């Protein structure tokens, strides 16, 4: 209890100062020097459902809480034994990026990426169907979107469709097997899956379950 109070007090002090200190103290970065994963930060570029760079992404950097980073390295070790590696699509996500998603979703005439990312869903229904929300676990720093390189998961990342549900019966047996393999290796190392997105995992014992950060990725 005393340790938790100390951490919360320290965090509140940091929040009143520089976001740089928060990153250094509580977050780590994954890169080619310390990770075997392919870092493919989709929201830094235009290969995403908005079709453009998202607010808050000024660099293609993967930030995760120190605890999530440690757990993910165990996943990498397990996959390396099978000559496999992760592909990472998104990590920590600033709250301003989530706000950007919300504003985009309200612009019903902007549908240039519909055929790729949400062909079966009307844009006006993205909130109702739960594909867009005002808050995201990614902003807490211990959620990651990923896949396994070379394995077919049945849908692209961020595909707004029931086929993206982890246990969807609409994918092939081989694709479901790949999803379950990813699920097992992630769960074995402390993560839990969001059932509506095969790529979405959160550290079970995340250090900041109620805190939504907003420092820019740079």
What are the roles of these predicted feature ranges?
Residues 201:
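Conserved metal-phosphate-binding beta-hairpin within the catalytic cores
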Residues 4-14:
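Sec-dependent N-terminal signal peptides
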Residues 17-91, 95-196, 205-218:
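Extracytoplasmic cell-surface/polysaccharide-interacting catalytic and binding patches
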């Amino acid at each position: 209890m005393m340790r938790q109070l100390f951490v919360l007090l320290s965090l509140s002090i940091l929040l009143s100062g520089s976001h740089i200190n928060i990153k250094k103290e509580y977050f780590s970065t994954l890169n080619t020097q310390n990770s075997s994963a392919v870092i493919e930060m989709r929201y830094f570029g235009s290969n995403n459902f908005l079709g453009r760079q998202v607010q808050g992404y000024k660099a293609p950097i993967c930030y995760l809480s120190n605890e999530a980073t440690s757990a993910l390295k165990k996943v990498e070790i397990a996959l390396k034994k099978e000559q496999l590696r992760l592909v990472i699509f998104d990590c920590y996500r600033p709250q301003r990026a989530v706000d950007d998603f919300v504003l985009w979703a309200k612009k019903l005439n902007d549908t240039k990426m519909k055929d790729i990312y949400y062909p079966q869903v009307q844009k006006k229904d993205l909130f109702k169907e739960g594909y867009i929300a005002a808050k995201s676990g990614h902003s807490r720093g211990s959620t990651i979107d990923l896949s396994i390189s070379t394995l077919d998961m049945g849908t692209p990342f961020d595909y707004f469709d029931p086929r993206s549900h982890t246990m969807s019966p609409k994918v092939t047996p081989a694709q479901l097997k790949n999803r379950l393999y990813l699920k097992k290796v992630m769960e074995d190392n402390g993560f839990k899956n969001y059932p509506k997105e095969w790529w979405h995992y959160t550290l079970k014992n995340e250090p900041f379950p109620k805190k939504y950060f907003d420092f820019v990725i740079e």
